[in-house]
Amino acid sequence: MNDTRVLRAQLTGYRGIGKIRFTLLKRASDSVWHAFAKPAKKCTPGTEIRFSDDLHATVIDKHEDGEVVLSFSCHGEALDEAIDATGQMPLPPYIKRAEGGDAEDTLSYQTMFADKKGAVAAPTAGLHFTPELKDRLLAAGAVFAHVTLHVGAGTFLPVKVDKLSDHKMHSEWGQVSAETAAAINAAK
């Protein structure tokens, strides 16, 4: 089971009075994140973005396909707390919500195995598990092992090419512990 926990990685920022939506993709350092910006055309290097009274960022780089690099006004644990306080759950496009979603999304868009913060999208295959289902599977002899795969926002992107091998995949971070590897290797 994937034990990743989804971050509140959807941020609404303001450049002057103009609104820009950001989806955090990948942390580059203690205070720097790669993110999708919409609309990205307003995010040139040097652009100041205000997310809240306590959270600001500067666009330090801009890439293709709406990706930008943000340097935040705080770092480390303070940045994590500010993102958690300011951000919303990054729901996939097929889940329609008013801007910002609702409080229930914070709970319902996590799997019951969610533990290690880092995903910017839920491992949707695990969303249907409930404690009751897990208990029934354990009673039937199933064995559970945990891996961590921090699902990235690339999972939201459509395939826009005719030839599948031309599609650019985004990277994701994963970890399989020695204990989990041994349990998988021992399974029949």
Identify the residue ranges that each predicted region occupies:
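Surface-exposed, charge/polar-rich loops and edge strands
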Residues: 1-188
